[in-house]
Swiss-Prot record:
Enzyme Commission (EC) number: 3.4.24.-
Gene that specifies this protein: htpX
Protein name stated in the entry: Protease HtpX homolog
Organism: Desulfotalea psychrophila (strain LSv54 / DSM 12343)
Record GO cellular component, one term: plasma membrane
Cofactor(s) the protein requires to work: Zn(2+)
InterPro entries: HtpX_protease (IPR050083), Pept_M48_protease_HtpX (IPR022919), Peptidase_M48 (IPR001915)
Length: 287
């Protein structure tokens, strides 16, 4: 309920701010209001639809097998561990799935805390000790308990709305400026679309940096939550184990942001969804 209230308050503040800016710039409030409504429908609507379909997309993209009846002792242990952590975290039991992949990875997704999905790769099960797998599960359960998927989707939706609205408004300003010169031709339909799409791409890059910054913050928070559901030592051991492998994530792009990502360099660091393993271990050791 708090998250929904915060979301509504945020959008109200955005509407008031944009209304003030439009008044100061002397823009037509009626056309701007219609554009803002369209941007909100596409920006926020697209983000929420993606969230609603996230479990289905994740299962299809990874070929994950949801454990309903355990086929072996490992699957039985996974269900038991997740059930215990869910009870400790005060959330509903999520679906637990395993997907085929050589790399050690895991992710959590879902629209509601009480109806989420936790999936681990076969590579993670083979490559980690039971204590380390328990810590990884605790990390993913912390994401669910913290409502990270919903929070990031709301942030993405607000930024999507900004990107669509500002790119169209900037294209309108350019078109009006060109229409007022001696030729008076303006951009034309295709020119307007090309400029707005280019601006959307540029603004979208900056929006992605903001989303990824929030994502990195949520990773530290989930690591901290894992220390309460498992232990600090187990979480550090799991991250140290990941350092020993050359991480090359096989997760499909649709769910890559939810899993463990290889380290990149330069400007690519701004687009990372996860902090470096070194930074995460250092943060845990400082607790």
């Amino acid at each position: 309920m708090f998250r929904v209230g915060l979301f509504l308050a945020t959008n109200l503040a955005i509407l008031l701010l944009l209304g003030l800016v439009m008044s100061l710039l002397g823009l037509d409030s009626r056309s701007a209001s219609g554009l803002l409504l369209m941007a909100g429908c596409f920006g926020m609507g697209g983000s929420l639809i993606s969230l609603a379909l996230s479990k289905w997309i994740a299962k299809k993209a990874t070929g994950a097998h949801v454990i309903e009846q355990p086929r072996n002792g490992t699957e039985e242990w996974l269900l038991h561990t997740v059930a215990r952590q869910a009870q400790t975290a005060g959330i509903g039991m999520p679906e637990v799935a395993v997907y085929e992949a050589d790399d050690m990875n895991a992710f959590a997704t879902g629209m509601r805390r009480d109806a989420a999905l936790v999936a681990v790769s076969t590579g993670l099960i083979r490559g980690m000790s039971q204590d380390e797998v328990e810590a990884v599960l605790a990390h993913e359960m912390s994401h669910i308990a913290n409502g990270d998927m919903v929070t990031l989707s709301l942030i993405q939706g607000v930024l999507n709305t900004f990107v669509i609205f500002l790119s169209r408004m900037a294209a309108n300003v350019i078109d009006n400026f060109l229409s007022s010169d001696e030729d008076g031709g303006g951009l034309g339909f295709f020119g307007y679309m090309a400029v707005s799409m280019l601006l959307e791409f540029v603004f979208g890059l900056f929006a992605s940096m903001i989303v990824m910054w929030f994502s990195r913050r949520r990773e530290f928070r989930a690591d901290y939550g894992a220390t309460e559901l498992a232990s600090k030592q187990k979480m550090i051991a799991a991250l140290a184990r990941l350092q020993q492998q050359h991480i090359s994530s096989s997760l499909p792009e649709q769910v890559a942001a939810f899993g463990i990502r290889p380290r990149q360099g330069g400007l690519a660091e701004l687009f990372r969804s996860h902090p470096s393993l070194e930074d995460r271990i250092a943060a845990l050791e400082a607790i």
